Amino acid sequence: MRHGKAHRKLGRTSAHRTAMFANMSASLIKHEQIVTTLPKAKELRPFVEKLVTLAKRGDLHARRQAISIVRDVEQVGKLFAAIGPRYKERQGGYIRVLKAGFRYGDNAPLAVIEFVDRDVSAKGKDSGPVYSNDSDD
């Protein structure tokens, strides 16, 4: 029987799941919208909503708790400086999950997970290293 099984395993070990959700939450905080599979998005939502609740508290202990979960100090800084104050008056429901069709190749159900009232200009900003096309060899 399936009593008391609160979360999906997603075919990963416990450590892999923890690391995956830490990385996905850092990406979601950075870009404020990401595309992933529907089961991952549904599991990520409470993970990030707890982080936003910590950011709304805003004290040093909450910041240290968020750093221990996300492990990306820069994104925790953004979480506490921009995202936490944005949702100060909202009592939960900071994340929206929208279905986005099926992935080509394995037909996996996709979803867009994003912050409600997100900053549209944050999407794709600083998404990786920039390589110049200079061929001065």
From Swiss-Prot:
Pfam families: Ribosomal_L17 (PF01196)
Gene Ontology molecular function, alphabetical: structural constituent of ribosome
Gene3D superfamilies in alphabetical order: Ribosomal protein L17
Protein family membership: Belongs to the bacterial ribosomal protein bL17 family.
GO biological process, one term: translation
InterPro entries: Ribosomal_bL17, Ribosomal_bL17_CS, Ribosomal_bL17_sf
Origin: domain of life: Bacteria
GO cellular component terms, A-Z: cytosolic large ribosomal subunit
This protein's UniProt keywords: Ribonucleoprotein, Ribosomal protein
Protein name: Large ribosomal subunit protein bL17
Subunit structure: Part of the 50S ribosomal subunit. Contacts protein L32.
